[in-house]
Amino acid sequence: MLGTDRCVVEEWLSEFKALPDTQITSYAATLHRKKTLVPALYKVIQDSNNELLEPVCHQLFELYRSSEVRLKRFTLQFLPELMWVYLRLTVSRDRQSNGCIEALLLGIYNLEIADKDGNNKVLSFTIPSLSKPSIYHEPSTIGSMALTEGALCQHDLIRVVYSDLHPQRETFTAQNRFEVLSFLMLCYNSAIVYMPASSYQSLCRMGSRVCVSGFPRQHEKHWKELCGRIVLDPEFMVQLLTGVYYAMYNGQWDLGQEVLDDIIYRAQLELFSQPLLVANAMKNSLPFDAPDSTQEGQKVLKVEVTPTVPRISRTAITTASIRRHRWRREGAEGVNGGEESVNLNDADEGFSSGASLSSQPIGTKPSSSSQRGSLRKVATGRSAKDKETASAIKSSESPRDSVVRKQYVQQPTDLSVDSVELTPMKKHLSLPAGQVVPKINSLSLIRTASASSSKSFDYVNGSQASTSIGVGTEGGTNLAANNANRYSTVSLQEDRLGQAGEGKELLSPGAPLTKQSRSPSFNMQLISQV
């Protein structure tokens, strides 16, 4: 300690002792102007063998017990450095040099837990109402509250939480050491906005040293003195993080990041969940660059104001909304594939297209939007297979058959997907009693074109196909196919039952299709509208 610093400290000690009570207020207003006093006091506190340490601790306690608030804050700025020296001396078991600092810490603690009458204080914490807006949340995100009599009664109710009573302590023990130090850190954090920059630096240095002392990370620091391992408490580390978080945004960005990493390092080794939770939340919320410290006297944290536009959609996801989304997607896919041919689903999937306009009530739509979307989706998957089948049939047809087929295909120009309906049927159909399959040679289609669709086209008759065309009185086209039809597996099994009903009367043009009149295979009825 230099002679000039010693003279400054001795002058400060003698000045306050001779100060009358009427001048304490003016003395407190001019105390912060002594720029050389604070660094000199730090040097006295750091040197445990200094003879001025005991009178300095006594003088700091007298300032704290005075009625002037600014004198209390002057003593509080040295609190982090006093804690570090106390913990370092406790580990080294130097009880003689530690007595005055221990008495000062206990004196501040006992003054804070009691009021003027000597009764223990009860600390109160106000819980803000979530129904009122703040810079941290929007009340609309919570949901609408029911306007009841109970809600109206509790609208302006302020909820207050009270802490337990803190007993007075006469000495430090291993059981109550960090209980006292945690409470002292709480008092320091409550007045941290009034602390100078030197106090923030002392807080960061104290946090790094108490966390890494006695661990391998200590050798990476540029400290002159080495210290043993210091036992820490999770609550004390959380209070330490509270002060460090404020110091980082008020001029101590580099020191704050260093102590934050050291606290995380120690909390991971000790498996302290609460300090880990707070420290990781602080680290993840830090900006990439240091905050703007050009504005002098800035004593607030920069907090992002809640945006006016909500960032998270509050639309409830229900079964109905998922169904509507699926229908919209199928409708969009159906519009893209609207020009493609319409084919029926596979026979093994259990769907049949026995739809007829005459079999439906007047005023009802024969198909829904979802069914049309399904038909268009099926059409894209089966177009390649149908092209191969059509090319195989073309190769076996005569020139005349091809001309006839072209004329037949060009006939129903007014067909639309709206005249097609899917109706669920069973996979395996059985003929009812007395029902026979009409012979294929006697089939004549009047105004209805029956297109058989099946997954397995296993059997194709190799004989030459003959086709005849007959035009009815109403302009309908009749097509008779001989030995050129494609049979499904179900059709081949039913053909073995016998051909007893060859002369059975066929359907009339206007008669609706019934279960007996439909083909047992899965077919799709395309109705031409005149």
From Swiss-Prot:
Gene Ontology CC terms, in alphabetical order: cytosol; plasma membrane
Segments of this protein annotated with the region Disordered: 328-410, 502-530
InterPro entries registered for this protein in UniProt: Hyccin
Location(s), subcellular: Cytoplasm, Cytosol; Cell membrane
Key words, A-Z: Cell membrane, Cytoplasm, Membrane, Phosphoprotein
A biological process term (GO) from this entry: protein localization to plasma membrane
Superkingdom of source: Eukaryota
Pfam families xrefs: Hyccin
Residue stretches of biased makeup (Polar residues): 353-373, 514-530
PTM annotation (Phosphoserine): residues: S321, S341, S430, S442, S444, S491
Phosphothreonine: modified positions: T30, T306
Physiological role: Component of a complex required to localize phosphatidylinositol 4-kinase (PI4K) to the plasma membrane.
Family: Belongs to the Hyccin family.
PANTHER family registered for this protein in UniProt: HYCCIN 2 (PTHR31220:SF3), HYCCIN RELATED (PTHR31220)
Subunit structure, interactors included: Component of a phosphatidylinositol 4-kinase (PI4K) complex, composed of PI4KA, EFR3 (EFR3A or EFR3B), TTC7 (TTC7A or TTC7B) and HYCC (HYCC1 or HYCC2).
Protein name as annotated: Hyccin 2
Organism: Homo sapiens (Human)
